[in-house]
A protein has these predicted regions:
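C-terminal segment of classical bacterial N-terminal signal peptides
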Residues: 15-22
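Bacterial N-terminal signal peptides that target proteins for export
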Residues: 1-8
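A residue-level marker of the well-folded mature domains of exported/periplasmic proteins
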Residues: 23-351
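Repetitive helical segments and hydrophobic/amphipathic motifs
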Residues: 11-12
């Protein structure tokens, strides 16, 4: 009997020692889903997302559609859910097109975080955001204004980006339009053009824009594919120095156009930091750590504080009229800084 009791005690002690370690060794699986693969912006973000996973001891899979397709993104979400992923970090091609797939994922306990481009807040927890529309719309307009002898002079402006439905780019472009209407009343907006994140199409659309509107003075491209595509179109038509073109893309993508003088200024944020932050946010939530609107947090190895702000800061009905507009456990996580690239600093950036 004594031997049995000793054996039982030994088993219980071993179980007590093993159980915490077993729990600690739980390895989460996080899917990192871009709008499209093969694009430098998303490849850099994906690489840093995977690296952050390694730092955290988390399995991170970077994969997504080869073409910019909402239907393809839905397929990837469903596949990740069926494969047992614990979290999905997604850059959405459409604010509503992924809702049902994300709803299904959340019903199965999958943590949803968005990055770069958001969905309806009801279908995610937090949005890792490069900057609210007022911040990024201002960056776009300022890059044009600072290249003019007189910012209040009469000019003709065009917008060229990926799609009329993509959440992020439209919010920045629409806020830029508001700034133009209120602060630069002599700027006339001629047209809005879209090239669906396809570089050859961006060049073609860019050339057609220049031919259709030969008097255009500035083209604003809040899209990492349209911006270099428009710059290439300007070079193809030998219009370098005649048209201001600004926008968002990686420094490695726009560098050649800046060095040739076709582009004077471009901008972005560190998309690698954004990718890493998306995975880190999902990891915190999986571990049960609270993220509260109004707070801020640091990420090891990344400079600056990540502020957590209310959904309403993003602007628009989807945010301002939502019952989650001022939620405390559902909101927007802002990157610490934005970057402006010129010929003087372009070589400092390695992404």
């Amino acid at each position: 009997m004594k031997r049995f009791a000793l054996l039982l005690i030994t088993i219980l002690v071993l179980a007590a020692l093993i159980a915490p370690n077993a729990m600690a060794e739980k390895q989460y699986k996080i899917a990192f889903l871009p709008k499209i693969i093969g694009n430098t912006f998303f490849e850099v973000a994906g690489a840093h997302a995977v690296d952050m996973g390694k730092q955290l001891g988390v399995e991170v899979t970077y994969d997504g559609p080869a073409v910019a397709s909402v239907a393809e993104q839905v397929k990837f979400i469903n596949t990740f859910v069926n494969q047992g992923y614990d979290a999905i970090v997604v850059s959405a091609l459409d604010p509503n097109g992924l809702n049902q797939a994300l709803k299904r994922a959340m019903s199965k306990g999958v943590v949803i975080v968005t990055w770069d481009s958001d969905v309806d807040p009801h279908y995610r927890t937090f949005y890792v955001n490069q900057g609210t529309p007022d911040i990024l719309g201002r960056v776009l307009v300022d890059m044009v204004a600072t290249q003019l002898p007189d910012p209040q002079q009469k000019i003709k402006v065009a917008f060229h980006y990926s799609s009329p439905t993509v959440t992020d780019q439209n919010s920045w472009a629409k806020f830029a339009e508001k700034i133009v209407a209120s602060e630069y009343k002599n700027w006339e907006i001629l047209t809005w053009q879209y090239s669906e994140m396809d570089f050859p199409k961006a060049v073609s659309v860019g050339e057609q824009l220049l031919k259709t509107y030969p008097d255009v003075n500035a083209i604003i491209c809040p899209d990492s594919t349209a911006f270099p595509g428009q710059a290439k179109a300007i070079e193809n038509l030998n219009m370098g120095g005649k048209v201001i073109v600004v926008g968002f893309t990686t420094p490695s993508t726009i560098s050649q156009y800046i060095k040739r003088g076709t582009v004077v200024k471009g901008a972005l944020w560190d998309c690698g930091v954004q990718g890493a932050a998306g995975v880190y946010t999902a990891y915190k939530l999986l571990k049960g750590e609270e993220i509260k609107v109004g707070s801020s947090f640091a990420i090891p190895g990344i400079q600056g504080e990540f502020k957590v702000v209310p959904n309403r800061m993003q602007g628009g009905d989807m945010y301002e009229k939502s019952d989650l507009s001022d939620a405390k456990d559902n909101g927007i996580i802002l990157l610490p800084e934005r970057l402006i690239f010129t010929k003087d600093n372009i070589d400092q950036y390695k992404f």
